[in-house]
């Protein structure tokens, strides 16, 4: 009976620990979590789509699997070699055989290390290429979405999909899938080798497997919970930082730094607590698996030692010193991949969830697509016609109602009206940023729906009130990566739109740095750069949407002079805030609630004493009072 006491002690320890973990798992109640993303794809569908990106690199994956066989072989063969060497040393010692055994072991080790190195290099290269392909497809798809669709998706969400989520997918190709495959084969290979060597000791090792399964199930529950907490806290703090760093000037103006710091500290501490919980979960799981490993080693030494001393085990198996050494190494190599499998499963689920988020964006069908018979426009004269056009952003809420007008080539036409009258909407429809529900819009007598979108927009130049400048230089913001444009052409255009007056004063001229969104330039300077960017691409139709709003008087005079020059370039459409800037327009269209009230020249509309006359009179008196 005393011979069994050590085994009973080991079993009691494992049983108590397992019971405590099961009790803890039962007591911890899962809170019903509100997931910001509901999964709609099954794992098989996701893997099939990812396989499409991996297919071009199938040959390289085959090479990786071939190289992986060497490292698997090392894990299975090396314990047998060490066991044989132990028996050689403890038995009839022969130096040549010892050298031969060491040489074989060293050779297997070198091949394993080399294969592992090349396997890692190939996987990293292939994985990054796959993710690069995926990112490019995702970015291209985002570019194809309409303005309406882009308005519905937060920019931060798109950035996360292109960066963070694709990084999570990258881990699956560069590490997880191959490691999971290798671990499974290593476990199976070790089991076969142990059974062939000594089935009694193998059965002893397998007695610990149920406890590993229990620990793994419990670990998965707690690790998922901890992982979600970290993810939620990270998202929360990133959102807070994005908003408050953008509005930090407002915080400073109102002196609310301490209050904002208190909010940030609370969110930062929440993230720290979540990270500590995740570390604790992993910190508990690894020692538990290690405890099982130590217990199995103790049982090995006890049963193996008893069998070695007695010459035979309980089931009649013969155990040598080499067998014990071999099993000692096998047990170590058996528990390590099992521990890795449990941890990597969570990362795999995370990668699959990230994949679904990426595919959910790629599955959004663009609302603005070319017709099957769409044509290319080699040139545009600039004739524009609206025929009974109706449009609404939301069903039943018409923004434009039966709008009809005609614009001749090289005419300058202004759209006037109160906020929400439909001015900017008309300009957006001309460029096919949105799809109208009824009527026709013609360019040079051709329905714009029969023209390729890229071809149509290539002939338009849009200048908006909120000018967007990219980080880079003045030159890069004007040419927009179009090749073949010389500095002389750029400077000529800058002089044409009066942008040279401030560019010449800069230290680096066209190479002057442009910071994020062009915040190191004034609103007027950004607008002049926008004019230069538009003119250099030689548009046939120019669109100015509130381009002279919020600009000082001196800059407005420069812009007015630029506009006069630009009228000769092509057809010009203007949405004006200041009516004084459109007095020389060939035609002024007055809108109200999506309908055209009146149209004509400046003098003709004043003579009518209608809505335009009222707007002009009010604005004139306001300017007189301000003056």
Predicted regions and their residues:
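Transmembrane helix-loop-helix hairpins at lipid-water interfaces of multipass membrane proteins
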Residues: 1-40, 61-115, 195-200, 311-315
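Hydrophobic alpha-helical transmembrane segments of ABC transporter permease domains
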Residues: 2-3, 74-78, 84, 115, ...
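Juxtamembrane helix-loop junctions of ABC transporter transmembrane domains
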Residues: 26-43, 66-67, 74-87, 108-155, ...
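A short amphipathic helical element positioned immediately N-terminal to and/or at the very start
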Residues: 43-56, 158
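Short intracellular "coupling" helices and adjacent cytoplasmic loop segments at the cytosolic face
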Residues: 55, 93, 128, 136-160, ...
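An intracellular "coupling" helix at the cytosolic face of ABC transporter transmembrane type-1 domains
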Residues: 55-59, 147-148, 164-173, 177, ...
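Helix-loop-helix
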Residues: 92-94, 100, 193-207, 277-356, ...
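ABC-type nucleotide-binding domain
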Residues: 363, 370-371, 377-627
């Amino acid at each position: 009976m005393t011979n069994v006491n050590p085994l009973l002690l080991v079993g009691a320890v494992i049983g108590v620990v397992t019971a405590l973990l099961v009790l803890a798992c039962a007591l911890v109640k899962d809170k019903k979590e509100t997931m910001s993303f509901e999964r709609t794809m099954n794992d098989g569908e996701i893997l099939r789509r990812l396989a499409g990106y991996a297919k071009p690199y199938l040959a390289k994956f085959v090479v990786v699997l071939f190289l992986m066989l060497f490292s698997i072989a090392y894990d299975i063969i090396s314990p047998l070699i060490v066991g044989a060497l132990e028996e050689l040393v403890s038995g009839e010692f022969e130096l040549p055989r010892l050298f031969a055994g060491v040489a074989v072991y060293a050779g297997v080790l070198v091949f394993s290390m080399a294969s592992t190195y090349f396997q890692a290099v190939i996987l990293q290269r292939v994985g990054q290429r796959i993710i690069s392909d995926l990112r490019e497809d995702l970015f291209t798809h985002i570019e194809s979405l309409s303005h309406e669709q882009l308005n519905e998706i937060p920019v931060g969400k798109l950035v996360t999909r292109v960066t963070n989520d694709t990084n999570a997918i990258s881990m699956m190709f560069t590490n997880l899938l191959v490691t999971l495959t290798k671990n499974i084969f290593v476990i199976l290979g070790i089991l076969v080798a142990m059974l062939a060597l000594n089935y009694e000791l193998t059965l002893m090792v397998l007695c610990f497997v149920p406890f590993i399964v229990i620990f793994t199930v419990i670990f998965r529950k707690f690790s998922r919970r901890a992982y979600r907490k970290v993810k939620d806290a990270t998202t929360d703090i990133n959102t807070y930082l994005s908003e408050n760093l953008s509005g930090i000037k407002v915080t400073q103006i109102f002196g609310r730094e301490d209050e904002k710091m208190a909010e940030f500290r609370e969110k930062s501490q929440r993230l720290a607590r979540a990270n500590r919980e995740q570390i604790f979960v992993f910190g508990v799981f690894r020692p538990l698996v290690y405890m099982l490993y130590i217990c199995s080693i103790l049982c090995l030494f006890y049963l193996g030692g008893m069998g070695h001393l007695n010459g035979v085990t309980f089931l009649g198996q013969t155990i040598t010193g080499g067998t014990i050494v071999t099993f000692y190494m096998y047990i170590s190599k058996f528990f390590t991949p099992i521990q890795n499998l449990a941890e990597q499963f969570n990362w795999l689920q995370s990668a699959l969830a990230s994949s679904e988020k990426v595919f959910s964006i790629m599955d959004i069908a663009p609302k603005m697509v070319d017709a099957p018979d769409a044509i290319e426009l080699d040139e545009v004269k600039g004739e524009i016609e609206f025929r009974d056009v109706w449009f609404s952003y939301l069903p039943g809420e018409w923004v434009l109602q039966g709008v009809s007008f005609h614009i001749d080539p090289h005419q300058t036409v202004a759209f006037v009206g109160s906020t929400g009258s439909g001015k900017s909407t008309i300009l957006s429809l001309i460029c096919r940023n949105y799809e109208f529900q009824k009527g026709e819009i013609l360019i040079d007598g051709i329905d714009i729906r029969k023209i390729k979108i890229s071809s149509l927009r290539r002939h338009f130049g849009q200048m908006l009130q909120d000018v967007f400048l990219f980080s880079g230089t003045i030159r890069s913001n004007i040419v927009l990566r179009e090749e073949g444009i010389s500095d002389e052409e750029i400077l000529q255009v800058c002089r044409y739109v009066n942008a040279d007056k401030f560019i010449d004063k800069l230290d680096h001229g066209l190479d002057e740095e442009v910071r994020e969104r062009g915040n190191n330039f004034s609103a007027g300077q950004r607008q002049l750069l926008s004019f230069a960017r538009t003119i250099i691409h030689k548009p046939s139709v120019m669109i100015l949407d509130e381009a002279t709003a919020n600009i000082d008087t001196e800059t407005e005079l420069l812009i007015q002079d630029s506009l006069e020059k630009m009228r000769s370039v092509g057809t010009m459409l203007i949405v004006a805030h200041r009516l004084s800037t459109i007095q020389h327009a060939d035609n002024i269209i007055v809108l109200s609630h999506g309908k055209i009230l009146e149209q004509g020249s400046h003098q003709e509309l004043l003579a009518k004493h209608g809505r335009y006359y009222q707007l002009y009179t009010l604005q004139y008196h306001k300017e007189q009072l301000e003056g």
